């Protein structure tokens, strides 16, 4: 078995991202193996890490003066004057939010809801989420509701998956250097759902479960 050593050079937050710089001491590897190892790390970081995001959303409307509220569904192309911006843009705002789970999330799909009862602006902090789930940035304005005659409910899927749409990884760079080429420098940028160090550890566990020990 070939052995290598990993050193943490930098690990900090910058402009809404976590940044990490790591050095892999690969003296026992050939030059081709070092490049292959760098490609494997980059590919796994970008494609295989799991994350959560909002999926499809549904909006329901009811007249506020009804004694027993009856909500009927409207589609995303409906023009509701009381909602600004358009429903299409509202749903897009949901999909652009990042969700963090404080504990392992085992479900493939869960749901969130916003109850729109008064005329005001609604933010990501108004989303009702299952236990242990949080929106990373709670102050994103989703829409403005301009009516006192209606009530709305917006229900959104919370989906778990891997790949670019779900992964917390924003960018990965690496370079093989040294004389001879004995080191691999790896840069990782993540959003605020995970830091660079925890993302690298999760990647190593995916590549080889023995790293979990």
From Swiss-Prot:
Compartments where found: Plastid, Chloroplast
Reactions this protein catalyses: RNA(n) + a ribonucleoside 5'-triphosphate = RNA(n+1) + diphosphate
EC class: transferase
GO MF assignments: DNA-directed RNA polymerase activity; protein dimerization activity
Highest taxon above the source species: Eukaryota
Function statement: DNA-dependent RNA polymerase catalyzes the transcription of DNA into RNA using the four ribonucleoside triphosphates as substrates.
Subunit structure: In plastids the minimal PEP RNA polymerase catalytic core is composed of four subunits: alpha, beta, beta', and beta''. When a (nuclear-encoded) sigma factor is associated with the core the holoenzyme is formed, which can initiate transcription.
Identification of the protein by name: DNA-directed RNA polymerase subunit alpha
Organism: Euglena stellata
């Amino acid at each position: 078995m070939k052995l290598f050593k990993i050193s943490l050079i930098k690990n900090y937050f910058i402009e809404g991202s976590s940044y990490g710089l790591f050095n892999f001491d690969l003296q026992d590897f050939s030059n081709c193996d070092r490049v292959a190892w760098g490609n494997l790390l980059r590919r796994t970081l970008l494609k295989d890490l799991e994350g959560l995001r909002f999926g499809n959303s549904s909006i329901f409307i009811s007249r506020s003066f009804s004694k027993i509220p009856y909500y009927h569904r409207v589609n995303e192309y409906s023009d509701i004057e009381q909602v600004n911006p358009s429903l299409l843009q509202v749903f897009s705002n949901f999909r652009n939010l990042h969700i963090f789970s404080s504990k392992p999330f085992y479900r493939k799909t869960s749901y969130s809801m916003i109850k729109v009862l008064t005329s005001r602006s609604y933010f990501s902090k108004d989303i009702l989420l299952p236990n242990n789930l949080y929106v990373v940035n709670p102050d994103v304005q989703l829409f403005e509701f301009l009516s006192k005659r209606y009530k709305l409910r917006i229900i959104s899927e919370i989906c778990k998956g891997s790949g670019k749409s779900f992964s917390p990884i924003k960018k990965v760079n690496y370079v093989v250097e040294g004389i001879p080429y004995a080191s691999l420098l790896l840069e990782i940028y993540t959003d605020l759902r995970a830091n660079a160090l925890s993302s690298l550890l999760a990647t190593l566990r995916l590549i080889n479960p023995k790293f979990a020990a």
